[in-house]
């Protein structure tokens, strides 16, 4: 029998490697940026902001996986990573019309306008007026860039995420993308009790805390983050050889035999968490 403490020790080494991958990615993104990059340098500035947000989400997912009881949140955060990847893919895709700079603006302006519509009823202590002023300033600056660059085309919205991920799912090693994205809604919206919990007698088993689930979600997180990072890097400089090296590090972690053994339910019988009713 493998004790829970031993299993956690095995997980720690994998989580540390996954976290280190994000530092490698951010370092390379910084290296690939235009040295004179400012808020209005497109697509570089837009790529930088989107990848920074995705990195924060990714690290949050790894952090949640370190504690069995909170690991369910990693699957919820995976949804954000896949959506960030879809936006980066849109910017990279010449078939979407215009140049990359304008596609980056189509995403940024679209997201900015869509986000402003969700702030309806705010808590009394939140200065909604000040937020809206800052938001409007940003939108005006983006609109100036749009006009200056002579951009055209439909703005990207949240409704475009699914179709983009469907296209990504037709590529080698990415067939899981669209299905996983759809399934994450079960944890985001908290209706997936059929696979998250299992009741036995007077106790409820936390299925999501099983090693196999945590290992599987780790593999999805690393894959999504690695692929979205590569997409961002290639937008900045497609020919840099370090991108291939980064890709190999991400692939090596996903294909790590230990990770696959854990995902294959090797330790599930030795590790169960129950909440007494």
Describe the function of each predicted region.
Residues 1-277:
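A cross-kingdom marker of C-terminal helix-rich interaction/assembly modules
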